[in-house]
A protein has these predicted regions:
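Bacterial N-terminal signal peptides that target proteins for export
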Residues: 2-11
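C-terminal motif of bacterial Sec signal peptides marking the signal peptidase cleavage site
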Residues: 20-23
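Lipid interaction determinants
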Residues: 25-100, 110-165
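Short beta-strand-centered aromatic/proline hotspots
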Residues: 103-105
């Protein structure tokens, strides 16, 4: 008899708990809306605001700010301009050019991009996106992972500000 009572109490407890937790769900009102157009988010001219390097082989894993190699307060920092026809241009006065001479650009997936890909007659360059850029965002971060063989050795992080769009 006690076993039946324990089983009944346990079943009642389970039903009560499930009703309690199912009653706590908030109701969703409205619609989420259409996703942002990632291609439109890239349009415009972007100027370098920060450049950092992380040495993956160092036991400290520190990140060094090397912005001074590109930003000297006199010359215009590197600028990338992305056009609607999927072409891009690079303007650089000082520092090393990690982006080629210009060409065409794209994403690995236009709906859910992970990589920015730059195509030129000489090379194809691929950069990790540090976050997706929407049309109203004013900053963009991309990462270039330098490899030796199959192992990554450095991560260069470029942060840009939109100067027109």
């Amino acid at each position: 008899m006690k076993r039946k009572q324990h089983a009944l109490n346990f079943a009642l407890l389970l039903v009560s708990a499930s009703l309690f937790f199912s009653g706590c769900k908030p109701t969703t009102e409205g619609e989420i809306g259409d996703p942002f157009d990632k291609v439109q988010g890239m349009m415009g001219t972007w100027e370098l605001s920060s450049f950092t390097q992380q040495d993956l082989n160092s036991p400290v894993k520190e990140t060094r700010d090397l912005s001074a190699f590109f930003i000297d307060g006199v010359s215009t920092p590197i600028q990338l301009t992305f056009h609607e026809d999927r072409t891009y241009a690079v303007a650089i006065e000082t520092g090393k050019n990690y982006f080629g001479e210009g060409g065409t650009w794209g994403f690995d997936d236009d709906l859910y991009p992970t990589f920015l890909e730059l195509y030129s007659p000489a090379d194809t360059l691929s950069y990790n996106l540090g976050g997706m850029v929407r049309e109203f965002d004013q900053s963009m971060r991309i990462e270039y992972r330098r490899e030796c063989g199959s192992a990554a050795t450095n991560i260069y992080t470029f942060e840009f500000n939109r100067i027109n769009g």
